[in-house]
Amino acid sequence: DLLDDYVNTQGASLLTLSRKKLAGRSVEDCAAKCEEEAQDCYHGNGQSYRGTSSTTVTGRKCQSWSSMIPHRHQKTPESYPNAGLTMNYCRNPDADKSPWCYTTDPRVRWEFCNLKKCSEDSE
């Protein structure tokens, strides 16, 4: 079941195992947020994407957002506390066209990630 990895709390909110609180107007709203978080696709420009993909369109591995090696940058978890800059997961902290990451390849600073748009967003 989708909600097995979530902890039930008071009212219409859930906590993920990492203790991230997901608030909602109803249990159904919370379940929808949980489902969106677990998807390997993104909605809109992907600013809300919180999946665990960490590979770029060319197959490069993503650099951790808290690391400055090999690329120094300003997009840190401290600078963007609500952007979900966890581990080396693909994210879109600056409202680009889709989720992206800095790469571990010293010759390639960043790339968009190998993610699809969710089907209901397709044109």
Swiss-Prot record:
What EC number is given for this enzyme?
Answer: 3.4.21.7
Q: Which reaction does it catalyse?
A: Preferential cleavage: Lys-|-Xaa > Arg-|-Xaa, higher selectivity than trypsin. Converts fibrin into soluble products
The residues covered by the Kringle domain are 40-118
An example Gene Ontology CC term for this record? extracellular space
Q: Which cysteines are joined by disulfide bonds?
A: 41-118, 62-101, 90-113
What family classification does the UniProt entry report for this protein?
Belongs to the peptidase S1 family. Plasminogen subfamily.
Q: What is this protein called?
A: Plasminogen
